[in-house]
From Swiss-Prot:
Polar residues: compositionally biased ranges: 121-135, 461-471
Cystine connections: C163-C176, C256-C288, C271-C300
Motif Prevents secretion from ER: where in chain: 517-520
Gene3D superfamilies associated with the record: Mannose-6-phosphate receptor binding domain
N-terminal signal peptide: 1-23
Organism: Aspergillus fumigatus (strain ATCC MYA-4609 / CBS 101355 / FGSC A1100 / Af293) (Neosartorya fumigata)
GO biological process: endoplasmic reticulum unfolded protein response; retrograde protein transport, ER to cytosol
Protein name: Protein OS-9 homolog
Length: 520
């Protein structure tokens, strides 16, 4: 793509220079980017043109340019007649249509393929003006500038009696139209001090950057021709980059200690349709010389201050040049690509794709096939339980040694825990389970309890037993010394009794769970 853009850049420059579209469409600006804000845009339509037809168009264009050059030496004569080989009447009609279509043709070679590009011609009446017309145009332009300046000052008159503020770090600025522009330090906002407008701190120095001319003096000197100021002395209309704005230069500010002269400031009023009156920015260009930009919708009421509209780019169409033998292959290839587009459009993705990411696919970004793991908070309450051993109705069952090794459990330690549960159960049913919860794994022993043994259950603690043999002694020692009583988790799961007549004692029946922590 970059190579194609570099190849087409000379074509765009040639079109801009040859057609004269710049002068007729908008004001010329050296900062304009031909590629970012193009006056022309190149298209490659899905069409072709025969080689014979392309040669004919280029030849007719060359003859037409020669005829226009010879026309200056034969005034009063009609257009020069083409003296080449005899053509049919249909070809003559096509020739007249082509010459009157307002296009110029250029042959281009791009990546080994020939193209015929049609460039639209844009009329430029400014270059055909005589000297008298140019002088008249300059006079009209001066009158338009004076009119727009008067109109701009009239629109800004509505700002009289109003002030705007701008805060920039330590300094704050106030702009009061027809009065002055001041730089001061504002008091910090607090009780009794509003955040806006900023209140000047009287304990610090403030500076006047510029004062407006006294309107009363202008009225007193209105009849005096020597002191009467013209409109352009008060304000000036400037143009930059196709946009016009009003400029007022103010002096008479506070004396500068470094230069020994009064401070001065240039105020620019720009049209901004989607904004209220506000100070855009202010900066010190040179020592004690400032520039302030004000955006106001008031100037937008005059067409002279409206921002330039972006014109639509003229289309340059480049078609492939094919011979008659290549047409069949080109059409077959085109039908194949159209069929592929239909197939691809019919395939709907399983998950919506946003920025090349399948939303809801549970995949790591940039890593194929990996599932996004849930955080610790998201997995609270989720448990995986597997029965390791249990006693039910006097019969004891447990997992085989191979199954225990799958869970990383030592069969000898499981046998020790089973014996410990037998001692605690005292002939009752019990269950030994392995539980995975919150990213941790542990062994839970559950013993069925009766009402007569509730007090004994409350006094029992949890026995901590690791799964690996290296920490077995540690778990048994904690159980014997009773240190695990503080860390024990004990809960009673109440269940519905099987007896037909529910009683108070039956409702309190349950089971005791003893936790054996599995340190992995």
């Amino acid at each position: 793509m970059i190579r194609r853009i570099r190849t087409l850049t000379p074509l765009l420059v040639l079109a801009c220079a040859g057609s004269g579209a710049w002068a007729s469409k908008k004001a010329f600006n050296i900062q304009d980017d031909l590629l970012a804000y193009p006056q022309f845009q190149v298209f490659f339509p899905d069409e072709y043109i025969l080689d014979a037809r392309a040669r004919e168009l280029l030849q007719n264009q060359q003859e037409s340019s020669s005829a226009s050059a010879d026309k200056t030496f034969s005034e009063g004569n009609d257009a020069q007649v083409y003296l080449g080989s005899r053509k049919d009447q249909s070809e003559d009609v096509n020739k007249e249509t082509i010459e009157g279509s307002g296009f110029t043709y250029e042959e281009m070679l791009l990546e080994g393929q020939r193209y015929l590009c049609s460039i639209p011609q844009v009329d430029n009446g400014n270059r055909d003006q005589t000297n008298g017309a140019e002088s008249t145009s300059k006079e009209d332009e001066q009158r338009e500038i004076a009119r727009a300046t008067d109109r701009g000052l009239e629109l800004l008159r509505e700002m009289e009696g109003k002030c705007m503020y701008y805060i920039s770090g330590w300094w704050s600025y106030s702009f009061c139209y027809k009065k002055q522009i001041k730089q001061f330090h504002a008091l910090p906002s607090g009780p009794g001090v509003p955040n806006y407008p900023p209140i000047e701190d009287s304990t610090t120095h403030s500076f006047v950057l510029g004062r407006f001319p006294n309107s009363g003096d202008d009225e007193d000197l209105e009849g005096d021709a020597e002191h009467k100021k013209t409109t352009t002395d008060v304000a000036e209309l400037q143009t930059k980059g196709g946009s016009r704005y009003l400029v007022q230069r103010l002096g008479g500010g506070t004396k500068c200690d470094l230069t020994g002269k009064d401070r001065k400031i240039e105020v620019q009023f720009h049209c901004h349709p989607q904004s209220t009156d506000r100070i855009g920015w202010i900066k010190e260009l040179t020592t004690c010389s400032y520039l302030m930009v004000i955006y106001t919708p008031r100037l937008c009421n005059d067409v002279a201050f409206l921002p330039p509209q972006q014109d639509e780019a003229h289309a340059i169409e480049c078609r492939e040049i094919l011979s008659e033998e290549e047409v069949s292959d080109w059409e077959a290839n085109r039908e194949y690509h159209l069929a592929q587009q239909l197939v691809e459009s019919a395939i709907t993705p399983e998950f919506p794709v946003v920025g090349d990411i399948e939303v809801g696919a549970h995949k790591w970004v940039g890593s194929e096939g990996k599932q996004i793991e849930k955080g610790r908070v998201a997995s609270i309450g989720e448990e995986k339980i597997e029965v390791v051993a249990k006693r039910q109705n006097g019969e004891i069952t447990r997992l085989s040694k191979e199954e225990l090794k799958k869970y990383g459990l030592d069969p000898e330690k499981i046998e020790t825990l089973k014996s410990r549960l037998e001692e605690l159960a005292k002939g009752k049913d019990w269950t030994l389970e392995i539980v995975e919860s919150n990213g941790e794994r542990g062994l839970v022993g559950t013993v069925d309890s009766n009402d007569d043994e509730k007090e004994d259950h409350a006094a029992q603690g949890s026995i901590s037993q690791p799964a690996q043999g290296t920490t077995a002694d540690k778990g048994e020692s904690n159980a014997e010394t009773g240190e695990e009583k503080k860390k024990a988790d004990e809960k009673i799961d109440h269940y519905e009794p099987e007896k037909s007549g529910p009683t108070t004692d039956d409702a309190d029946d349950g089971s005791e769970e003893i936790f054996f922590k599995d340190e992995l």
